Amino acid sequence: MITKSFLIAMSTLLLTACPDSNRTHAQQKPAAPVTVKPAPAKPAPKDASAKPADKDAAIITSIIKDSEAYYKELCKDASVSKEERRSKLILHIARKFLGTPYVAKTLETKGKERLVINARQLDCTTYVENTMAIYLCVSNGQTSYDNYKNQLRLLRYANGEVAYAARQHYFTQWIEENTKKGYVHELQSPTPPFTAEQLLRIDFMTTHVSLYPMLKDSPDDIKTIAQRERELSGRRYRYIPKTSIRNNSLFRSTIKDGDIIAITTSKKGLDTSHIGIAVWHKDGLHMLNASQIHKKVVEEPMTLYQYMQRHPSQTGIRIVRMK
């Protein structure tokens, strides 16, 4: 006869054999494969034997399907403007990645450059790229996984060419190339709140080659990137000083939910040091971003103004809008 005490003992044994499988957010070690749960969409399958590429495909496909359904409902509402649909869809997609571990340099691979798709681990740039690639797919009705891969390639590389030197390492180049492709435009105005001007002096990569393993042993790539740095240097861009960021009608009418925030920097040789996605709360402008501080994708609890005051080298923000 199976007694009650026997059943309790077996239950305890099974629980002991199944430890908690929650994701880790440690930055120093490679993050374990995880599954983003984009509620209310069905979560990606938790198959421990699945390859990372299969998990990435499952995550992206799940987010695309959920976002496609969300967008169709938005389009049925005649009271929602085209601009509001864009903002709402971008935020909807961006929030699907909340909690995803922050891992730097996931695009750096051994050997030849390839199109890296990693939805399990994100840095600030890959977070924005993945969000915007999915946005472009859904808003244009091209929602297959192959459509997504193609869109990501076009966003990430100059002329869509998968090569290390063609990857848009400087965000100013990313803006420029994707403006040419018709995906984005940068807000540039001589009037407030764009009251400051950034003069570019770009040379960080070629003066810090040792920081880039895929670059240091490639003289041709160094030469190509040095040429691109020279082309970017000397350009001037309007930006909003961090001390000027406010929660008022001017800022709310200028910066929209879903805009890309590019944080300008005083660090020598760089144009920007961090990027994220704008989101307004009652207390002011906040930022969705893959955070090195929080070690995951977060909707920053501090306002952007408060956040930037804690980073002395951050000077202000440039604003880029998806089309």
Regions found by a protein language model. Give the residues of each.
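N-terminal secretory signal peptides that target proteins for export/translocation
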Residues: M1-I2
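Sec-dependent N-terminal signal peptides
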Residues: S5-L13
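C-terminal motif of bacterial Sec signal peptides marking the signal peptidase cleavage site
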Residues: T16-A17
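Compositionally biased, proline/threonine/alanine/serine-rich low-complexity intrinsically disordered stretches
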Residues: R23-D56
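Cationic-aromatic interfacial patches
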Residues: K51-T131
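Acidic/His-rich structured neighborhood in mature extracellular/periplasmic domains
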Residues: T100-R238, W280, N289-Q292
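Short alpha-helix capping/helix-loop boundary micro-motifs
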Residues: Y239-F251, T265
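C-terminal soluble interaction/assembly domains
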Residues: S253-K323
